Amino acid sequence: MDVILDILKFSVSGILFFLATFFVLKNLLDNREKERRHQMRIETGKILTPIKLTAYERLVLFLERIKPESMVVRIQYPAMKAGDLHLMYIQQVREEFEHNVSQQIYVSEDLWRFVIAAKESLLQFINTCSESVPNDVPAVELSKILIEKYNETENPPIDIALVVLKNEIKTLA
């Protein structure tokens, strides 16, 4: 009977020692893993933050470049007709968007939705304005209408997208 008690004492103390060692080592390894993940997040942030800022800059440029007053200055030619200008505006907005479509992986889904909404709204706006002008009149007539009506618009989608973009940039700091 003493032998069984001795075996039980050693077994129980061995099991307790094993369990204590196991939990201490598990805790130590878990802490090291948490620290490693934390360091990886810091390193990833150091790499991604400049890339994200570049994406935000490019989206600001995109939104500013597709504003009617900006496109009028860049695109209009002296002998151009309104119908040709209409097509060039549409083409320019689409090209600018396609050039910046990859930026969506660096910004929030909400911001990207605002950018798309701004683009789509502008395309619709350009089409609507061009319907009010005959295709064969000088392009300057369409340009005037675009700028006048755009300036009359309360909270243009491009401006809303820019506000959302700027607010998202502030969350990076």
Model-predicted regions and their roles:
Residues 5, 9, 14, 18-22, ...:
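Conserved non-transmembrane functional hotspots
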